[in-house]
Amino acid sequence: MNYKEIEETLNQYNDWNITSISDDGRVNSQDSEGFVCEKINSILGITKIKTSNREKYDLYIKGGEDLKIVEPSSFTNTISFTKLAKMLNLKGNNNNSIFDSYQTKKNNGELKLVEDYVIVFLNKQTKKITIASLTELPEECIAVNPSNCIQTKIPTNRVERTQDEKFELVHNLFIDYINKRILTPAKNWEKLING
């Protein structure tokens, strides 16, 4: 089953039972994730495979998708700096190691998009699911946040991009985050990405 078929299958259900105990919507979403993931696994007949660095209730439909239970017009924290770096074929788990990897990969012409990031959005109002990769999202559904790297919101449509356009999108998000968050305290990036 491809993601479109999975989305259609899941949208036959509307009893997603989203918690609304807290005044904080993020808390309610997190409290609901376990139930929603278990229900998705049950509907799709998935025996969840827990890989390293996965939370108990993380989705694993095909490759570790990210479940977001959100209001239709709200941005939600989605992709960390290290995950964004990994998408671009970079190694490392902190600013310095990712900087070294970027420098090496850039000098060797090895910067490329090696994986996409799939998000399963559950709309709190309509109880409908939208499955989209980062590179399918329209630009107005993606924001760079200096504190949390990449935020996304539920798209009303998807964008088809070439492989080069997908790389440019992710690479530009990476650079935008560095310029907003890292560049001020770490000037060593400036010449490498902007010079």
Place the predicted regions along the sequence by residue.
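Nucleic-acid endonuclease domains
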Residues: M1-E55, I69-G195
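Conserved catalytic cores of phosphodiester-cleaving nucleases, focusing on short active-site segments
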Residues: L59-E71
